[in-house]
């Protein structure tokens, strides 16, 4: 009995040490960002309510599903394939009209040469209209290949958000110190011209969003990108 308890103690200490070694400190560049959360401000059920993200407000989370032969969720382990369409609005500072955001899964229209993982044939695409955004504002997100064995791995995502002359890249990366034993997407980091400027963490009940400071010209684009990922019903997290 003493031997068994001793062995259990050794195993427990080994697991604790392993967890401690895997947990990561927050990147130092996050010190130059503002940490925010999407706050419900009323107007409906959770996920379909009015919200605020700092100075950015709107209504979001209107997600619908329908059966489809080819869809964003092209899992071989699922008999029913679905296509998710998400709509939300964002009122930018100084604007009276809201930006209308429409996102949907569909056939790949983005060809990112910098993506290194083996990707699915489908992408997640968002369009942004009105509310003071430049014409052609859009976001494309590519997903890693799916399948029975792939479902056991960490999902990989990569995308580009175009906001006038600002092009932001988004890549899956853990951005906080919490250790989560989950195969889901843990977070995204946003970069411009190779410099990390913002992020969103998917860990925990409240997703943490890191935006450039208020005087940074990348703040609005980063907020729109973060909200697009916040409302994305990622198949890797289902």
Regions found by a protein language model. Give the residues of each.
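Short linear Ser/Thr-Pro motifs
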Residues: 18-24
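Bacterial N-terminal signal peptides
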Residues: 10-18
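Intrinsically disordered, low-complexity proline/glycine-rich segments
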Residues: 25-238
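Bacterial N-terminal signal peptides that target proteins for export
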Residues: 1-11
């Amino acid at each position: 009995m003493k031997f068994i308890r001793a062995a259990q103690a050794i195993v427990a200490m080994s697991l604790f040490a392993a967890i401690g070694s895997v947990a990561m400190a927050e990147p130092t560049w996050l010190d130059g960002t503002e940490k925010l959360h999407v706050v419900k401000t009323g107007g409906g059920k959770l996920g379909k309510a009015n919200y605020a993200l700092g100075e950015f407000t709107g209504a979001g989370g209107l997600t619908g599903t329908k059966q489809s032969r080819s869809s964003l969720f092209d899992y071989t382990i699922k008999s029913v394939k679905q296509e998710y369409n998400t709509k939300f609005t964002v009122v930018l500072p100084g604007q009276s009209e809201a930006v209308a955001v429409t996102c949907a899964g569909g056939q790949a229209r983005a060809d990112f040469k910098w993506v290194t993982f083996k990707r699915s044939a489908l992408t997640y695409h968002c369009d942004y209209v009105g509310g003071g955004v430049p014409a052609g504002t859009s976001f494309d997100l590519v997903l890693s290949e799916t399948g029975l064995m792939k479902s056991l791995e960490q999902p990989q995502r990569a995308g580009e958000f175009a906001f006038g002359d600002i092009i932001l890249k988004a890549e899956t990366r853990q951005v906080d110190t919490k250790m989560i034993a989950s195969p889901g997407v843990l977070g995204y980091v946003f970069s411009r011209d190779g410099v990390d400027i913002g992020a969103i963490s998917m860990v925990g009940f409240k997703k943490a969003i890191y935006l450039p400071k208020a005087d940074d010209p990348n703040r609005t684009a980063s907020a729109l990108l973060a909200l697009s990922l916040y409302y994305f019903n990622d198949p890797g997290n289902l």
